[in-house]
Amino acid sequence: MTLELFNQEFEGIVGQLKSYLLRITASIADAEDIVQDTYIKAQEKLSTFREESSLKTWLFTIASNLAKDNLRVQKRWVENVTDITKAAALSNKKFFEEAMHIRTTSPQGQFEIKEHIAFCFTCISKSLPLEQQLCIFLKEVYEFKVSEITTILNTTEAMVKYYLHTGRTKMINVFEGRCALINKEGVCHQCSELNGIFNPKQKAQEEVMKIEMAQEAEKGDKEHLFDLRMAILREIDPFKSKASELQLHHLEHNRQLMDNYLEKTSI
Amino acid sequence: MATTVKTTFSRETSVSADIKADAAIVWALLTKASDYPRWNSTVTSLEGNIALGETIKLKSILDAKRTFKLKVKEFEPEKKLVWGDGQGNRVYTITKNGNGAVKFSMVEKIGGLMFPMYAKMIPPFDQSFDQFASDLKKESETIMNSK
């Protein structure tokens, strides 16, 4: 592959690569750094690229290997991350002032429940063991085949299936217990609550019912509801969406809090 | 079906199952402690790191109030896992049969000179062994057949 063709194809893949890295680092700066390092490494090794896999698979392999060395990728959060960060945000006037400023001034400062669903998944998925988190994103969001994930993560098909199954099952159970969009008894209403703050003229329940996952909730098919949640993530580019600036601000807030929380609770 | 062989000073229960799944999947399920209660209906909690020399804490449906502290004595990836205490050992073995399936077996022998004194206080293992093997087979094959 020539450098010119590589650069051209890289442009088409870089958006997905960057969003993948953001979702596993929860850090804008780290995601951007790893994208740059991936480009440099890929360019250096271009002569070794035999096109046995697609360029997208090859780039995700390089990026995943670089990401595994990143401390923020290695750090595992806790399942109730959104409870911890909500409590902190409520006592942080500056956070809401900044968020409201973004909401009123930025073209990418809209609040949409769907975008918050994607953001929420990013945060909670960091409580999974790393391999499970990576497999879920690669398969369900970036639509790699199991055989391609074996290349990206340098593991066997059996283990990819194991990570996918255990990760999916864990996340299904977490959301079933927490998410009020799919379970009336769910303890977390943050997306509707934030919609009330950022879009006070909207009726939150009406907004919720525009989302297919919420419409399908009563049928109780947990696997299907998880697939619908993944479909929401696939639709959203966290760097380019209408709510990206607001959600990135929120993500930075959560990451900093979790960095401190994990430091305090580590033995 | 599980079988038990009793002698004056020991009791040995064993069960085996043919599992149509990769040995790596069976091994991963057997060695991820915190995941046990999700797929294994005989284990209510399992804490610790299943690795050679580590101590784990097991709670089982056989005696919900008791926590068994067990040491991991052998750890041969995708082949053999042994944990136990002073009263006995549980041995798990996985044998690849060449066509992508494995034979899983689980044996627990308890005993010693004092065994006759407490033998009657230990409930039979047969049913929970059958359940364990059946749960492992079901979960392994579900994972193997996933797309």
What is each stretch, according to the model?
Chain A
Residues 39-43, 53-82, 164, 168:
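Σ70-family region 2.3-2.4 aromatic/basic alpha-helix that recognizes the −10 promoter
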